[in-house]
Amino acid sequence: MQTLNRRDFPGRSHPDKIIQFGEGNFLRAFVDWQIDLLNEHTDLNAGIVVIRPIDTDFPPSLSTQDGLYTAVIRGLNEQGEAVRESRLIRSVNREINIYRQFDDYLALARDANIRFMFSNTTEAGIAWNEADQFSDAPPSSFPAKLTRLLFERFEHFDGAADKGWVLLPCELIDYNGEALRELVLRYASHWQLPAAFTHWLTENNTFCSTLVDRIVTGYPRDEVAALQTELGYQDSFLDTAEYFYLFVIQGPQGLAQELRLDQLDLNVRIVDDIKPYKERKVAILNGAHTALVPVAYLSGLDTVGQTMDDAQISRFVEKTITEEIVPVLDLPEDELLSFSQAVLSRFRNPFIQHQLLSIALNGMTKFRTRILPQLLTYQQQKGQLPPRLTFALAALIAFYRGEREGQTYPLQDDAHWLERYSTLWNGVKHGDIALAELVNRVLSDANHWGQDLTAVPQLANQVTEQLQTILSRGMRAAVAAYS
């Protein structure tokens, strides 16, 4: 069976226009996949040069396959039908190992055609390293590497205003574009680079903050043989992802024309502020995940897919989203409901097996960041507590007993919470404290919640009553009132 290469698998090729820091699965099934679609259906005509930002030879270079690889997209489409699409991605031209090919890396700065930069160097990638020097070949941090490249471009083109870049970091941190911009400017100052360079950076380069959303499941180890037989070639860089994707870019509206988004209807939004979209994702997608985990797991289910196949629990999830989360979010209702339906479809994806216990990791912090804001806003706006969100909190407290149908299961959270719950539940078990006292001690932890939640009218009472019902009647009977 042949291995992918451009000689044996000829097709479209495109001039270098994009630099991409990061060779991992996510960008290849997200950015590179979208650029490939734009190359096919518009006149974008943009090739990608991938920069490996860390000093490692594993995995092998994409250049061993001339940049070619297959993206397998699978999930439920807008009609709820299971679909699978295999696409040979031709948008990547080659990969450069910056630690072995530093001169080739700097040469990219001197290419007048380069216009865009994408990156995903993980959440830890956009960071400062005091030890990085301009003379390092290369510096260690990603922002320092980028600063060095930008200065090379500034010098080569004598600070030409039309040679700046559009920079679109995809790292999962808030306002990633602003964070990257600040660090690049900090390196420019730290290295005492000319003031004219700083002016060129701020006036002629556009740092865009982004929000990225797609579950990328990566290399399908257990299915590789079958997939390669079906495709008819060997592909060491096979990449799999869900059907849904969303790319929100905080940037100038002209970017839509530059990326040819006006010629192809991709799920990309150019907006003035990504904050509402971040809040929507955290509240609906992540919030629903966090709300369903303890309810579903204590109902005897083990995966998100099983949860959505269970009529009772799936109704609880849907009503939680549409009746208690969506009404308090600050975006048009039709957009929120459309996103909610997409989330529910993603939860039903038969190609992804999300274990509830893995999602349960750090559940206390997740509840605080993903659900509590909506719970409190609902109470303030409507003068009453959202019953399903408080039930999710009661279920979470019950979950930290660590017991389902007489069997224990592993709990993964901050040691402080694991120790506290162990002590509290033992106290209830031996009759040393009442259930209401357990709830009060959990809710009154202002260091965790940011406030004493026992001060929220009726919250402690409602959670205690719901928790008592869960313990006395079982989760199935308790959740029936909210399904």
UniProtKB/Swiss-Prot annotation:
What are the entry keywords? Answer: NAD, Oxidoreductase
* Enzyme Commission number, as recorded: 1.1.1.58
- Give the enzyme class: oxidoreductase
Q: Which GO terms describe its cellular component?
A: cytosol
Can you name one GO molecular function term for this protein?
A: mannitol-1-phosphate 5-dehydrogenase activity
Q: Where does the chain cross the membrane?
A: none
- Spell out the Gene3D superfamilies in the cross-references: N-(1-d-carboxylethyl)-l-norvaline Dehydrogenase, domain 2, NAD(P)-binding Rossmann-like Domain
Q: Which Pfam families match?
A: Mannitol_dh (PF01232), Mannitol_dh_C (PF08125)
Q: What's the name of the protein?
A: Altronate oxidoreductase
- Please name the source species: Yersinia pestis
> Which gene name does the record give?
uxaB
